[in-house]
C-alpha cells in the first residue's frame, strides 16, 4: 500500500477549500462565493485539522490516508480473521483487489469510509442489538453519511432492521440522537450554502441525460472494473451468494445493502475513476465472506483462495506484482485508471520532496496565474491548477462543479460524456458579470434567476429574512420557472 500510494487531482479540489478555510476565507472554493464543491464534509474537516498545523498538502494526504488505512487493516485482522485460514483468505482479498489498494490512499475520502463501515459492520454483526447498540449504529451511520452521503445506502437495510427489532419510542429517540452529527451538518449546509447537497451533486445528477444512457454507462463501469480488477467484482458477487446461503438475517441485510449501493452506482452511470465506488463494497464483502466460511483450510476455502489469487494475477496490471501502473487502456468509455494517470508525478515514491510540488503542467499553469496576479479564468476545474493558482483567482468552472449557476444548466454533447465532466456553455454576459461583479447576464429570465441565487451565495447576512425565504424558495423549486423559460428561449434542453 505504501509503495502504491498516490494522490488524485480531485483531492486538490477539496484541498483548495481546505486552504481557504484554514486561511480565514471560509468554507469556499472561490473566496467570493459560498459554494460546496466537496462531497465529503467529514473528510474535509479532518484534512483541515491536520493542514492547520502542517501546511503541506502531500504530507496531509499521505499521512491521513495511510494512518486510517493501517487502522482499518488492523481492525479487519483483529475482529474478523479468527483463524490462520481466515487471515490468509481475508488479506488475500484485500491485497489482490486493485480497487481497495488504489483507494486506500488517493487523497479522497475512501479510507475514512472504509474504517467507518468496518466499525459499523463489527457492531451490527457481533453485538447484541439493544438500545445502546442501536444508538451507536445510528451514530456511526451518521458519520458515514457525514463523510459521503451516498454511502449511507449500504447501511439502510441494517438500520431498518434495528428499528424493527426495537419497535418502541426509546429506540426512535436513540436513533435520532445518534444521527445528530449528520443532521447538524445538513442544517449548517442549508444555512451557509443555501442547499442541503453539495454543488457537485447538482452538476452531476441534474444533467438531463436519460436514465437509459446513464445505466448503459453504469454497466460499462462494471465491465471496466471486471477487466481491470476481476477480484473486486468476483468478491462482491460471491459475498451476496454466500450471504443468501447462510440464512443469517443480519448477514443477508448487509448483503442487501451492498446490492442496493451496487444498483445505485449503475443507475448514476458509475464514475470516471475506475473502481472508486466499489472499494467500500469490497471491504464489506470481504467481511461477509469471512463470516460465512469455515475457520480451517477446507477444500472450499482453498478453492476460493486459489480463485482469488488466480483472478488477481490475471488482471491487466496487478498491483501485487508491480507498483508501477502501466498506461494500459487508461481511458475506456470515459473511465480512467486514475492511479495510472497520476502515479508518475503524484505517487509517494515519485514525488520530489525537495520542492514538494509535482512536476505537472497544471501545477505550472496555476503558479503562472498566481505570479501574474490573474483574478479570473474560465475553463474546467482541475484540482492541481486551482490549488496552486491561489485564493485570489476566481475560476468559472465549465464543468459546473465549482460554479452554482452552471451546475444548474444542462450540459451540451450529452450523447458523448464523461461522468462528472459535463461541459456547460457559459451564458452570454456571465463572463462580464464575473469581471465587474454586476449582473450583466443578457437573458432576462436567467438574470433574475441568478440575482436570486446571488442572495444565497454572496449575501453577508446569513440569517436575513430575505435570504432565509430565498433558501426556502430555491429548495422547493419556486424559481425553476425562470430557468425553464431561459432554456426554452435558448433552445438548450
Map each language-model feature to its residues.
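Membrane-proximal envelope and lipid/glycan-remodeling enzymes
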Residues: 1-493
